[in-house]
């Protein structure tokens, strides 16, 4: 069975985090919400608290992931960008030839991790300056 890890940071956008988890789980995909906040409770950009399945410190190296997923939202995307564990996991995933995904503002995290060089990418309107040398 496929396995997806979705990283959550305070300031995430609710629909971008929860809709993919809902659809994937309904489709039989093992989907694990991972908090990077040092606690399982993660607070969205609009004050909704979600309880993650794991904290990043409990999750291992994510080598069993088929996809690492990043929801957008602010300041959630910048919180993800600034977390070295997230960046390292994304880089390992890409080096292994496995998938990474980012929604709305979160492609800025992929750019920061150096994963968008010469690749097509999209981002929330007006944030294209965060994509580095990606093809926008």
Would you name each region that the model predicts?
Residues 19-21:
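Histidine-anchored nucleotide/phosphate-binding helix
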Residues 2-12, 23-36, 53-136:
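Active-site-adjacent pocket-lining segments in enzyme domains
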Residues 43-53:
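A cross-family phosphate/adenosyl-ligand binding-site feature
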Residues 12-17, 41:
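Short N-terminal binding/cap micro-motifs at the start of the first secondary-structure element
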């Amino acid at each position: 069975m496929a396995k997806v890890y979705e990283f959550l940071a305070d300031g995430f956008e609710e629909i971008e985090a929860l809709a993919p988890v809902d659809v994937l789980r309904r489709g039989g995909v093992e989907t694990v919400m991972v908090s990077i906040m040092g606690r399982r409770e993660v607070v969205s950009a609009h004050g909704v608290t979600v309880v993650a399945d794991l904290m990043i410190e409990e999750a291992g190296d994510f080598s069993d992931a088929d996809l690492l997923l990043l929801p957008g939202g602010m300041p959630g995307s910048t919180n993800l960008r600034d977390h070295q564990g997230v960046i390292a996991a994304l880089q390992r995933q890409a080096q292994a030839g496995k998938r990474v995904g980012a929604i709305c503002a979160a492609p800025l995290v992929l750019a920061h991790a150096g994963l968008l060089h010469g690749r097509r990418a999209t981002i929330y309107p007006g944030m294209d300056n965060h994509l580095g040398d990606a093809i926008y």
